[in-house]
């Protein structure tokens, strides 16, 4: 039986964002990837004098998926789409609080892609919070990270790359007679990224398409 969730819980979300070192290379689902062929996106926090992964607290009524995408954009300027979920980190804070951080694999949305038009503008984090960002190799990132939990997440990304599990796709399963909204049908968007508007009353299908890919059974005939 899982341990009970702490009463004083601070929920946060973030992503380990990666890209190929070769900008012309296209990611294919199930393709094994040499970790030397990718870079990961890190942020420097002057308050703690450390390098870490972009993340932050959820806002009122915000889903974890939307928070992860928003926080990455606030801290790095990158608009991303989320892939597979990673290990959730949990640790104690002062005052009897427990922090729970949910992470996903993230990839940058191509510049000028239609999904950018679905998002509200996001203000960048102040330099007192994040003063540097860096794309770096997984090998160098392992030396830069200071927290063991962050290094475990990096190890997961590296393992997924080697095993062909880094690139995933989203599968929408509709009940018989259920159709996509015109917004999604017309866009044909495979890079939809979650946004506060999508998570708080926007198109349900758009929000679903932005969520991490999960295996689902195929629909059965009615």
Residue ranges and their predicted role:
Residues 13, 102, 131-132, 167-170:
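Generic beta-strand structural signal
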Residues 8-12, 22-25, 104-105, 147-156:
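Short coil-to-helix leader/linker segments, especially the first N-terminal amphipathic alpha-helix
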Residues 167-222:
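Active-site-proximal alpha-helix that buttresses catalytic centers in soluble enzyme cores
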Residues 2-53, 170-184:
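N-terminal strand-loop-strand
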Residues 150-168:
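Charged phosphate-binding loop/patch that engages nucleotide di/tri-phosphates or the phosphate backbone
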Residues 58-149:
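Unchanged
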Residues 8-10, 35, 96-99, 128, ...:
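A generic fold-level signal
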Residues 32, 56-57, 98, 150, ...:
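Short, glycine/charged-enriched secondary-structure capping and boundary segments
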